[in-house]
């Protein structure tokens, strides 16, 4: 796009600019642009998904080691010899998309975070199959360790960030916002009819949730 053409977009809102960029991207498929969007991107990262599905296949193999006399049934993951069986699975699927990513993740957790591979594999296999539901009630133990390390790295701004904290995994950003508002209300920090400030533009549900009958907050938008 020519510089002179860009000038006419100066007066558009961020949402209007976003819509125009999507229009341009869809009209030039030979040079598609990635749309980070507001929760609905036009792309997916494929490598982690390949790794996820390979983990699922391995977990199913582990489940099928139990109840072998019953067709189409499986049991809980057995911890004894689990790491050795995983290593064989990786070797047998050398070159398959996602295998290297999965193995590298297990190796990283051991070397960087001190998580025993067998313990992590047991937890991952149980989780992806859905064993022991609804335990845990908050977050998988080793997943919390991994996520906490990520948060320390990304939000520590290069400074030491060693204070312990708990994490609570939720369904997604919208659910998280709902829980935040509900917690603030239950603890009497916010009450029905209170005024809150919200930075915008932002994912639309974040603007809509405070208006629900449960909260009825008065919103003041802080435009970016």
Predicted segments, located by residue:
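Conserved N-terminal helix/loop that builds the PLP phosphate-binding region
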Residues: 1-105
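Conserved core of the PLP fold type I
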Residues: 70-224
């Amino acid at each position: 796009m020519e510089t002179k053409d860009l000038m006419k977009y100066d007066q558009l809102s961020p949402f209007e600019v976003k819509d125009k960029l999507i229009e341009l991207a869809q009209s030039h498929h030979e040079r598609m642009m990635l749309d980070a969007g507001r929760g609905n991107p036009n792309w997916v990262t494929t490598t982690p998904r390949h790794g996820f599905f390979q983990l699922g296949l391995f977990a199913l193999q582990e489940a099928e080691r139990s109840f072998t006399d019953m067709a189409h049934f499986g049991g809980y993951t057995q911890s004894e010899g689990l790491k050795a069986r995983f290593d064989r699975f990786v070797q047998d699927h050398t070159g398959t998309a996602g295998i290297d990513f999965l193995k590298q993740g297990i190796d990283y957790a051991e070397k960087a975070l001190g998580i025993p591979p067998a313990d992590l594999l047991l937890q991952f296999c149980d989780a992806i199959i859905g064993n022991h539901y609804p335990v845990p009630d908050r977050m998988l133990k080793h997943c919390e360790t991994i996520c906490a390390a990520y948060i320390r790295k990304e939000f520590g701004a290069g400074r030491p960030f060693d204070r312990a904290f708990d994490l609570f995994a939720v369904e997604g950003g919208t659910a998280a916002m709902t829980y935040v508002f509900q917690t603030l209300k239950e603890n009497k920090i916010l009450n029905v009819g209170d005024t809150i400030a919200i930075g915008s533009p932002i994912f639309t549900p974040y603007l809509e949730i405070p208006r629900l009958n449960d909260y009825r907050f008065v919103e003041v938008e802080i435009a970016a």
